[in-house]
Amino acid sequence: MEIKNITVLGSGIMGHGISQVSAMAGYNVVLRDIEQKFLDKAMEKIKWSLDKLVSKEKITDDERNKIISRIIPMVDLNEAVHNTDLVIEAVPEIMDLKKKVYAELDKVADNHVIFASNTSTLPITEIANTVSNPERFIGIHFFKIGRASCRERV
């Protein structure tokens, strides 16, 4: 399966960074959070980071604009996972919260969608057992968001 569309759940430090590097890699990204104000702040941070790359001549203005155009901020979960291939969850490291997110996600995502948790401290198998098809669940951990393309898969 080729991945073209990614949904990132959570727009905090990790979520907005994952969205940025995914868009920089050419993927279409939906950045989803529970309130618009969180999304607005995340998009400001992404734009600031990209502006810095432009000022250092790492990317052009045109590339910056194309990257930003590939990120769609969204509050509605159903809409956020529509047509997605991969969901990367980056919500706070609270097991009950992650389980709640995946229980909701399991109800609305298509059967082909891969679920990925960015957790660095919680057991992946415990989170994966929340969904109906745990075999489509992976752990993926990003490092140095926005500066490197390094990630760990569990």
Model segments located where?
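A structural alpha-helix within SAM-dependent methyltransferase catalytic domains
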Residues: 20-23, 47, 81, 106, ...
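Hydrophobic/aromatic beta-strand patches that form the interior of the parallel beta-sheet core
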Residues: 30, 72, 88, 138-140
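Rossmann-like NAD(P)-binding element
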Residues: 37-41, 52-115, 121-122
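NAD(P)+-binding Rossmann beta1-loop-alpha1 motif at the extreme N-terminus of oxidoreductases
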Residues: 1-52, 56
